[in-house]
Amino acid sequence: NNFNLCELGPRSTGKSYIYEQISPNSILVAGGQTTVANLFYNMSNHTVGLVGMWDCVAFDEVAGIKFKDKDGIQIMKGYMASGAFSRGKAEIQAKASMVFVGNINQSVDTLLKTSSLFDPFPPEMGTDTAFLDRMHCYIPGWEIPKYRPDSFTNDYGFITDYLSEFMRELRKDSYSDLMDKYFRLGNNLNQRDTIAVRKMISGFTKLLYPDGEVTKEELREIVEISLELRRRVKEQLKKIGGMEFYDVNFSYTDNDSFEEHYVSVPEQGGGKLIPEGMCNPGQIYTVSQGKSGMLGVFRLESQMLPGNGKFKRTGIGSDRDAKKIHKYSFQLLESKWKPYQWFYNYYNERLYY
């Protein structure tokens, strides 16, 4: 039941405070600097490190995360995937979840245009797709309001020690199969995506409906937010790793109506491949196979401007096959234009593609 979470956002939203104060079973590693011996296993005195002593290990200020050992990140990747690590001759199991919190110093729009939402991480982690793919969830810290005096309630609440111990006891249970009664996940989710989403469904259900009694619509809301949080990770992996992570169109299907619902992330814009309504003049969408043989959606744009009758191609780069197809298509059109009177008036104009 290990869980790997990332939350990056503006300052003063309580990111560090939660992991430092809300539970006696979590520890906040300030500054991010640590060693393999401190975090995992000390070979000299044969003692397990922080992951064996705490339920949650949170790294504050991800930009400063640094291992003094060269193999630190590799060991962390293995632990994040399986909840186990090897030191010496032994393989050691631990139950601590990994949390990474930090600040974003630019707007989300700027990050999406210039780099990725994992940009605050050090380069050896923020560009390592194997490490980032092990992140189950990315909480959008920019959507969380900053704390102010009126953010706190005057009503009664649980003492944090009681609440944390109650939630700790619930770790023994799993609600990840509750969704199977009403929904099933789409085929764009691979095994790692499915594990991440099911972990989140179980966690949200424990927080909101700890008795496990949840209606279909209540569960639908949990499924959608879980898909969004995992898709945010996958969208950034696609930016960093390219088409290896092409399958980002996360969805779920209603078992009663068989209707498939797609879930997008707000900062990426619309969740539909083709926008609703009429296309702009000169635009058309089509489905075709790319060079790899994979089906994809393509948008073709054309524009006619006064010219000298020559054919000019733009926007297709150095793709030789695409150039050849455009050339042959125009030659065919040029050879067949005479029977069509409507084309006569346009012949002395330049076509841009």
Language-model features and meaning:
Residues 45-48, 81-96, 111, 119-128:
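Conserved Walker
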Residues 150-151, 177-252, 256-258, 262-277, ...:
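C-terminal helical "lid" subdomain and adjoining coupling/linker elements of P-loop NTPases
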Residues 112-146:
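A short helix-turn-beta junction within AAA+ P-loop NTPase domains corresponding to the substrate/partner-engaging
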Residues 49-53, 85-103, 133, 345-349:
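AAA+/SF3 P-loop NTPase mechanochemical coupling elements
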Residues 53-79, 93-96, 103-114, 130-131:
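Conserved AAA+/SF3 P-loop NTPase catalytic/coupling segment centered on the Walker-B
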Residues 1-27:
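P-loop NTPase catalytic core of nucleic-acid-dependent motor ATPases
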Residues 263-353:
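Conserved P-loop NTPase/AAA+ ATPase motor core
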Residues 17-58, 62-69:
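AAA+/P-loop NTPase substrate/partner-engagement loops
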